[in-house]
């Protein structure tokens, strides 16, 4: 995979603008790591990625270049091409990288929200449990919470009403029922439940699959919890969509097994109603057109 120069992208935008039938909208520039597109440091430019460390985990590498100016200038150049009406970033951004930019991060967020979000912005926190995020090799949840706050503040200041669409995954190696419950409580607190639940699926050649296969973290060879059986995977997946009537019995089972019966009942601090089998007050009929505060499509 190779990055493209600004000149190459602008040249293609000009070709698109002259293409018959083109409506003036470019729907994505940069892919899912759009703002983290340049080599991370001088060492990566010469010899590729480091074999013994990651750029952002467990702490940002001191050699890491954090700068959004080149990407921001590229977006400005593309949207200034005659015939281009809108340039969107729809695959998502690396929010943890953005939050490290103390000099230009706010300017980037301003232009991102004002010019490049069509109403919803996809991001991939993947989980909120720091234990699971550590297994994933990702920044802790505090980075995502700071990003959420900045996104909300920027929207308010610019008079916009945009939504975050976070991607979460269940049953990743390292995740227990306690971690899945922590994620469910986060979803309830933020008012967002995903319409689709993504379960971990092992794929060859990945660190996570090595964990899944061996039950060990290859980085330190310590045991790591793994949800292998279909039952536990179903329980964790149900907690991602805790408010669906069809998941009620699984959510109750998960809470009781984890010793969290305190979350069963009615009220703001509860996860699932103790009402009848039809679902109680925690379960509502789906209404697809009314957005949730954080961008879901099912109101609470």
Features from the language model and the residues they span:
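A generic structural motif
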Residues: 165, 194-202, 266-268
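Structural recognition of alpha->loop->beta junctions
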Residues: 107-120, 184-198, 204
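Radical SAM enzyme core and accessory elements
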Residues: 204-300
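Radical SAM enzyme [4Fe-4S]-AdoMet core and its adjacent flexible, acidic
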Residues: 40-69, 135-136, 141-142, 188, ...
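Catalytic cores of alpha/beta
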Residues: 104, 172-189
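Canonical Radical SAM [4Fe-4S] cluster-binding loop centered on the CxxxCxxC motif
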Residues: 1-7, 47
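Conserved SAM/AdoMet-binding glycine-rich loop
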Residues: 14-165, 169-173
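Conserved, mostly hydrophobic/aromatic
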Residues: 9, 123, 151, 197, ...
